[in-house]
Structure formats: C-alpha cells, structure tokens
Amino acid sequence: MLGALQATEVIRFDEEDRRAIEGLGSHPVVRVLADALKFYFEFHQADGLGWCAYLHDPLVVANAVTGKFASTRPLAVDVELAGTLTRGQTVGDELGRWGKKPNVDLLCDVDARGFIEHLMATLRGGLG
C-alpha cells in the first residue's frame, strides 16, 4: 500500500489535535508523540505551511489493517534511479505506458477526520 502525499497530507494535525494528545496523560508514548508533533509544527511553520503536522505513515498502516480510512486503486510504481531531480523518488505509471502490472494499492479519497478520531480513540484505549 502506498500513500502519496496528495492522500496523506489531508491528515493535518492542528493545535486542537495537539492539545488533545497532550491531554491524554503522561504515558511515554504521549510524550514522544507530543514532542514529535511539536517538532513538525515548528518545521512546517518555518517552511511557510503553517502551524501543523502531517501524519503520513500512521494513516497508511491504519488503512492497511482496517481498510476504513481510504479507498485504494492499483498502480504500477518504480523508484527513479537516474534522474538528476527525481533520483530516489517513487513514480507511478498513471497512463499505463510502462506495460507493467500494478504493484501497489494507492490510497485515494481519505477520511481525514475519521482517521484522526480513530487514532485518538486508539491512543486513549491503549495507553492504560
């Protein structure tokens, strides 16, 4: 399963979400997550994107396990190894020109609020 930035960047944590996580208590996972969010909030603010953080990997994992937070579609992808601007970038054959079978399920139509609510409920229920 692949979560391209167009899909995963709809999981945008704002200040209210950050405070809600901090309010979950003093469990080490809460502290680590709160610190990570603060780092990314500051990073995105400095980069001109605002006081926010995006949670890419947790969305992809949660959807792979539950199938509840995004639809998927098959896509052939490969990693660009020769490009001077795109070296190391995952690229997809959106037009089917490569003649290769799809090798990933690409996330589409993400339920951002549903995922955030699921993540918060998981953290509340699993940190006891």
Task: Tell where the protein language model's regions lie, with residue ranges.
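N-terminal acidic, glycine/proline-rich low-complexity segments
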Residues: 1-128
